[in-house]
Amino acid sequence: FSTSAPAFVIGNGADSSNKSDAFKVMFNGDTTVSNDLTVSGDVVISSDARLKSNIVSLGSTLPKLLQIDGKSYEMKGKQKIGVLAQEIKEVFPELVSEDDNEMLAVNYQGLVPVLINALKEQQNEINRLKKQEKRIDRLEKLVANID
């Protein structure tokens, strides 16, 4: 068997040419759910540093994040809010995957570190502006005392 072959399929098809599979688990562990997935507990993702290698900081993410536009859209008859995979792929290609049918998907969880760094950048700018405002206030008081 191939590790990229289906190990378990719920639906009326077992290959990429039949798009009616509702749930598919591959031998390599990849899992596909073809519609909404409701979880009553937590969804947790392994993130232990011991599992990772070549760890580097993302650095500045705000300029790239500003190139992404949140969208409201209809998909499968339901109103949704999200992003377009094509836009994400332009700035964060590692967050976009493609299935056998060349349909793109976004790793929304992967946007969290991007948002954390952008938030830090904005907070640093806010702090810098607050310090600048205090200096301006002091200078205005000095100028007022000269008059």
Segments from the language model and where they lie:
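C-terminal intramolecular chaperone/auto-processing assembly modules
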Residues: 32, 47-57, 94, 98-147
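Residue-level detector of conserved, well-ordered beta-strand and adjacent loop positions
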Residues: 11, 56, 74
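Low-complexity, small-hydrophobic/phenylalanine-enriched stretches
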Residues: 8, 23-39, 43-45, 49, ...
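Right-handed beta-helix
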Residues: 1-21, 47, 93-94
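Residues that recognize and position ribonucleotide moieties
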Residues: 81-82
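Periplasmic N-terminal gating module of Gram-negative TonB-dependent outer-membrane receptors
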Residues: 53-67
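Active-site-adjacent helical/loop segments in soluble small-molecule enzymes
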Residues: 88
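Active-site nucleophile-His-acid catalytic modules used for acyl/amide transfer and hydrolysis
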Residues: 68-76
